[in-house]
Amino acid sequence: GVEDVICFTYGKKGNREAEISRQVAEALGYQWHFVEYTNEKWYACAHTDDMKAYYSYAGNLVSIPHIQDILAVKELKEEGNIPENAVFVPGHSGDMLAGSWIPQDYDKPQAYTFGTFLEESLKKHYSLWKWNEAELGPLFEGKIRKSVEDISVHDNESCANAVELFNYNERQAKFIVNSVRVYEFFGFRWQIPLWDAELIDFFLRVSLMLRLKQVLYRDYVVKKLLVGAFEFLQDLECTTDLKANNKDGTRNELILDLKYFLSKIPLLENLGKKVYTLRRIHTAYDTHPLAWYGVIPRDSFLKIYSGRENINSFVGLFYVNEVCPAPLNGVVKKYFTDAERILSAI
């Protein structure tokens, strides 16, 4: 296999993703580094001149900056754990190609129209703050229409195609892949092999039923990748749920079916959402596996956080404040439904 490989991951100590990363690196015999993330580290980093410079460099007036890797790359470089000529190879956007962004219920009998696509896109990509629908709804819908132009939506396959096209154009290209700016910021090069043109062309020809729930990807990994010299990787925790007919796969199907059932009973669905949201509000600051809500003080976070926000909600405000600080208060007051609460905290 490939030699001279350094693997790294990051987050709170003991987080599940870090453990999976360690297992895979050790199984393949690669060097592995873990960078611990804490609320305190994030707060210290968020208010430095370096972070302000990174916002300007990475956002480039196109997207909010992607900050997830910045603590790790900074610390690895400062401690000499990666050579100056290192080339970073992240996995963007393998999950997207395999079908991870297609709504899981697109194999169910339901209406599939352009309106369905608009609703899915607004829910997924315009939900980080509670905004004034009368003011911003037409604007956001116009942006979505412009991105996909005159795409036809008439069944589940064409609706999934529209969902993915908008995601490719607006999320993957402008935000996810733009995360490589952090490597450049610290003087490193990068490659994104999963955006190879041949691979993209192949998945453009894959039918919905093989993309939905990542059916083709899972089957390929088990039957073609984790075989021969790499068959032992099938026993790692992170790969066991790829196997056909295993209990985890069955459990996931049951969860999806339960969610679909609850969606048809609004009272039960709303009750479940309220219970889940209350729990998140009281635990998110200290339990997030990346600890990154530490970019703001705990008391400010608890004033603002309603359960719908994520780190990009806050980074978006920070970024707007960096590029045009004077109008921020006016923008928040005009377009945010909880403007006074948000402004009092920030």
Predicted regions and their residues:
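Short secondary-structure boundary/capping segments
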Residues: 24, 49-53, 99-114, 207-210
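ATP-dependent adenylation/pyrophosphate-handling site
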Residues: 1-28
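A conserved beta-strand->alpha-helix junction
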Residues: 18, 22-57, 97, 147-151
